[in-house]
Amino acid sequence: MANRVDHEYDYLFKMVLIGDSGVGKSNILSRFTRNEFCLESKSTIGVEFATRTLQVEGKTVKAQIWDTAGQERYRAITSAYYRGAVGALLFYDITKRQTFDNVQRWLRELRDHRDSNIVIILAGNKSDLKHLRAVSEQDDQALVKKEGLSFLETSALEALNVDKAFQTILTDIYHIISKKALAAQEAAASTALPGQGTTINVSDNSANVKRGCCST
């Protein structure tokens, strides 16, 4: 989902955080949106939601971030929240091998529900616990090469690469939407009659750019 409201932000992008329960998604979200970290963070029940506004190449982008429950019993509920998402951060815990082994299951689920243009970044969380690492760097590099994903390691505790992960995915989303808007303008211009003005409306399931003085 991408909306434009002139007086608040230029674009609104919906994102989802996915991965097994306990990998640290909620702490990543609280670190990014409130710069907070809780050692006793509890597992998400259903879906949590937060926003943060930041600059992407001179544009004001509001990230609407949905933190989905990792437990299997909530899958039917949270899968509905994939709808309209243009970005996904998929997390595993570098100290728990099973969370890494489940990454491909999460990718299958995401691809079953995703928009075709969704941007996906894989993140190995809890990099502050490298002495307990259960996933080798060779394993994660092999997976990202196989799946064609961007990758980085994060730590909500140390605030390592948290902002970078979101900045990277929001920039990638912005590039995709900008290219689609430009392509639509060029297509419309090529079909316009000589001497006539052209009005361009860009709209699809993943990007809906609006102009006006309204607010949401």
UniProtKB/Swiss-Prot annotation:
<dbReference type="InterPro" id="IPR027417">
    <property type="entry name" value="P-loop_NTPase"/>
</dbReference>
<dbReference type="GO" id="GO:0005794">
    <property type="term" value="C:Golgi apparatus"/>
</dbReference>
<feature type="lipid moiety-binding region" description="S-geranylgeranyl cysteine">
    <location>
        <position position="214"/>
    </location>
</feature>
<feature type="binding site">
    <location>
        <begin position="155"/>
        <end position="157"/>
    </location>
    <ligand>
        <name>GTP</name>
    </ligand>
</feature>
<dbReference type="GO" id="GO:0003924">
    <property type="term" value="F:GTPase activity"/>
</dbReference>
<feature type="binding site">
    <location>
        <begin position="38"/>
        <end position="44"/>
    </location>
    <ligand>
        <name>GTP</name>
    </ligand>
</feature>
<keyword id="KW-1003">Cell membrane</keyword>
<dbReference type="GO" id="GO:0005525">
    <property type="term" value="F:GTP binding"/>
</dbReference>
<dbReference type="InterPro" id="IPR001806">
    <property type="entry name" value="Small_GTPase"/>
</dbReference>
<feature type="short sequence motif" description="Effector region">
    <location>
        <begin position="41"/>
        <end position="49"/>
    </location>
</feature>
<dbReference type="Pfam" id="PF00071">
    <property type="entry name" value="Ras"/>
</dbReference>
<dbReference type="GO" id="GO:0005768">
    <property type="term" value="C:endosome"/>
</dbReference>
<keyword id="KW-0342">GTP-binding</keyword>
<feature type="binding site">
    <location>
        <begin position="125"/>
        <end position="128"/>
    </location>
    <ligand>
        <name>GTP</name>
    </ligand>
</feature>
<feature type="binding site">
    <location>
        <begin position="67"/>
        <end position="71"/>
    </location>
    <ligand>
        <name>GTP</name>
    </ligand>
</feature>
<keyword id="KW-0449">Lipoprotein</keyword>
<feature type="binding site">
    <location>
        <begin position="19"/>
        <end position="27"/>
    </location>
    <ligand>
        <name>GTP</name>
    </ligand>
</feature>
<comment type="similarity">
    <text>Belongs to the small GTPase superfamily. Rab family.</text>
</comment>
<dbReference type="GO" id="GO:0005886">
    <property type="term" value="C:plasma membrane"/>
</dbReference>
<dbReference type="InterPro" id="IPR050209">
    <property type="entry name" value="Rab_GTPases_membrane_traffic"/>
</dbReference>
<keyword id="KW-0547">Nucleotide-binding</keyword>
<feature type="lipid moiety-binding region" description="S-geranylgeranyl cysteine">
    <location>
        <position position="213"/>
    </location>
</feature>
<protein>
    <recommendedName>
        <fullName>Ras-related protein Rab11A</fullName>
    </recommendedName>
</protein>
<keyword id="KW-0636">Prenylation</keyword>
<keyword id="KW-0472">Membrane</keyword>
<dbReference type="InterPro" id="IPR005225">
    <property type="entry name" value="Small_GTP-bd"/>
</dbReference>
